[in-house]
Amino acid sequence: MIGQRITIEICRASTSELVTVDAWRTATPGVVVHESPGGIWWAATHQRSGTVIATFEDPYSAMAFAAAIGEFDWTRSGAALVADPAVERCVIRRKRELGALVTVFNGGPERARRLSI
């Protein structure tokens, strides 16, 4: 993988469980790439909140997605990013272009607490 390896805590959208994973920094500050806990897919994740933005079949597509959404300041809180309609439009467009597996930038009950981080 390209980028510095770090450890982050992510919030599983299906269960709101917090899980620690190894991740890699990307060219976009605030966005990291990691393998899913079950090893099924790769995700581009908002580092500050641990919220998955999009999932892909391979790490290279996830890295390309992270670079493609780099026009925004991903070091902001998750709440600020979710509230920005331009971010949402860009994320949806880039997911379609790069073949994301799942459309996410959410979470379960844990979301409200995590997004403020």
Where are these regions (language model features)?
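Short intrinsically disordered terminal tails
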Residues: M1-I2, V102-I117
